[in-house]
Every structure is written in structure tokens, then in C-alpha cells.
């Protein structure tokens, strides 16, 4: 993990793999935030009703959102899962956090799963929750704008 602190962008973080939201087990540490669709069973910290856009449109809008976020770098894309991952670096200490998003058709529209987690430390002082809420707000605005 030390290399993650001295790296830039997406360098230095563990090799990405697709995240299976159906089997995700949240850690005991308070340094994550999971958003799940309100129509899906799960253990999310936050829920969101289905979005009124296709999964592809949601992911395209999320790509635009991520591109506009400071210190955010693409990490991986898994098209078969309609999933993308990014590294977000803290301004002061360069700590890397990972954010994973996946969109899928659900009853009533498109369900969004978003998981933001710290790679270093026990507590994040609410940073991951604030990030998920900010990304969700920006995504909703991007979808409204078309």
C-alpha cells in the first residue's frame, strides 16, 4: 500500500477486478458507502429509485461526471457487467479511494449500484458517503440535461 501513496492517478492501487454487488460483503470499518437501487435487496447505506434512462445512458453520463471530478482517474471498465471503476485521490495526503459503479435494467428503469471505499485507514470521516451523494447529484443533473 505504500506505493499507492507515492503514485499518481490510478497507478499503485491493487489490480482491478469486477465487483459482484450481489455477493459484496461490507467491511466492519466505517470507511465505505454503498448505494443500491431501492427495488433491489441489499445492504446499502443509501438507496435510489430506478433512473429514467437506459443502463448505457446512465454509464455514459457517469463517465462525464467522473471526468469532471477533481483528482479522479479511470481504473477499469467491464462492459459485460456495465461496470466502471475509478481512483479518487485525496488532495492533502494523496490517499487513493476506489469508486465502482454499475447500471442494470430493473423494474421501473435502471438500477444504480455505487460503492466508494477507502484503501487506507479505518475511518473516512464521511468522505465516501459525501462522494457517493455528490456523484449521484451530478449524475441526476447530467441525465436531466441529456
PLM feature spans:
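Ser/Thr-rich, low-complexity intrinsically disordered terminal regions
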Residues: 2-146
Amino acid at each position: 500500500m505504500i506505493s499507492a501513496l507515492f503514485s499518481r492517478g490510478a497507478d499503485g492501487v491493487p489490480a482491478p477486478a469486477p465487483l459482484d454487488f450481489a455477493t459484496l460483503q461490507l467491511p466492519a470499518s466505517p470507511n465505505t458507502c454503498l448505494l443500491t437501487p431501492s427495488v433491489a435487496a441489499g445492504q446499502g447505506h443509501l438507496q435510489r429509485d430506478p433512473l429514467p434512462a437506459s443502463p448505457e445512458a446512465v454509464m455514459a453520463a457517469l463517465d462525464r461526471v467522473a471526468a469532471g471530478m477533481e483528482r479522479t482517474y479511470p481504473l477499469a471498465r467491464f462492459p459485460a457487467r456495465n461496470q466502471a471503476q475509478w481512483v479518487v485521490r485525496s488532495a492533502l495526503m494523496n490517499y487513493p479511494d476506489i469508486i465502482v459503479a454499475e447500471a442494470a435494467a430493473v423494474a421501473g428503469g435502471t438500477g444504480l449500484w455505487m460503492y466508494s471505499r477507502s484503501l487506507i485507514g479505518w475511518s473516512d470521516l464521511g468522505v465516501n458517503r459525501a462522494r457517493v451523494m455528490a456523484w449521484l447529484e451530478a449524475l441526476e443533473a447530467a441525465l436531466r440535461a441529456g
